[in-house]
């Protein structure tokens, strides 16, 4: 009986073959490689600190499907490469260093077809000492984090720059009215409110600028000028105006993607304590928050 059942099962199972599995996408690399470089010009020093990630695509299928590591570039080797090229090539321009890394991996490893380099900069400012900036002492600069994303192929290179984690706020010149109202709506309309957001913006270069860092600074300045000086009827409208300002300021970029989470500042109810709150005291909240995103292009 057991033999009969086994034969019966094997005959039936032959009709229901499990389809072959295949690997449809892969990449790998080294992440969170931190480098800090000191530039010395006499007694005056400057520093640049980056967190780098390198991801490779190419002929690595066998390492996943056959445990064949012969073409695998060890991630420890990637780390060493980043450190070496930082010593040799890292200067003021984050994007130039990313391009150098991408070019190196494509030139050195013929089986690599695509290199994605992510770079996040940790900015430093000079510590005031004796009424002037100190020559070689620094503190963390601001809240914004500049970053870059470099994609290199054998056909071309793509450079994207941006900033993230920039908390900006205006105490007036902002409102929100005439929005859709239905049975789920409780939000009151207003023509005067606090507008606060943690800005993230990334712009794509269509050609190389004279200086990536100066261009990035001008783009951010243009967007912040709109935020500060223009009345905001909604985060959506302000996002679009900021994107247009970026494109107008820098003709070398093709588009800008902006994320502006609406970090609500809620008026504190002081009436139980016999006090009136005339738009003076708020509770800033991170969640839940409105998530406003948009891309503006030419």
Where are these regions (language model features)?
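Short, Lys/Arg-enriched N-terminal segments with co-localized hydrophobic residues
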Residues: 11-20
């Amino acid at each position: 009986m057991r033999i009969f059942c086994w034969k019966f099962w094997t005959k039936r199972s032959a009709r229901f073959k499990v389809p072959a599995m295949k690997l449809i996408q892969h990449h790998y690399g080294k992440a969170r490689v931190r480098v800090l470089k000191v530039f010395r010009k006499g007694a005056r020093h400057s520093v640049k600190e980056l967190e780098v990630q390198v991801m490779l695509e190419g002929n690595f299928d066998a390492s996943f499907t056959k445990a064949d590591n012969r073409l695998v570039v060890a991630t420890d080797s990637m780390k060493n490469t980043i450190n070496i090229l930082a010593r040799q090539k890292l200067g003021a321009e984050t994007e130039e260093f990313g391009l150098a890394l991408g070019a190196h991996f494509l030139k050195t490893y013929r089986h690599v077809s695509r290199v994605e380099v992510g770079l996040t900069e940790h900015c430093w400012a000079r510590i005031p000492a004796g009424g002037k900036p100190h020559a070689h002492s620094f503190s963390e600069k601001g809240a914004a984090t500049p970053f870059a994303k470099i994609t290199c192929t054998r056909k071309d290179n793509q450079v994207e720059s941006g900033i993230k984690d920039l908390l900006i706020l205006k105490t007036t010149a902002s409102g929100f009215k005439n929005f859709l109202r239905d049975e789920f709506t409780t939000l009151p309309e207003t023509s005067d409110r606090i507008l606060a957001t943690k800005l993230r913006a990334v712009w794509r270069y269509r050609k190389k600028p004279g200086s990536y860092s100066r261009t990035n600074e001008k783009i951010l300045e243009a967007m912040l000028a709109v935020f500060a000086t223009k009345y905001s009827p909604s985060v959506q409208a302000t996002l679009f105006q900021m994107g247009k300002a970026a494109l107008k300021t820098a003709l070398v970029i093709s588009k800008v993607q902006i994320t502006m989470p609406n970090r609500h500042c809620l008026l504190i109810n002081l009436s139980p304590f016999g006090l009136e709150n005339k738009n003076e005291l708020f509770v800033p909240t991170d969640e839940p928050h409105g998530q406003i995103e948009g891309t503006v292009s030419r």
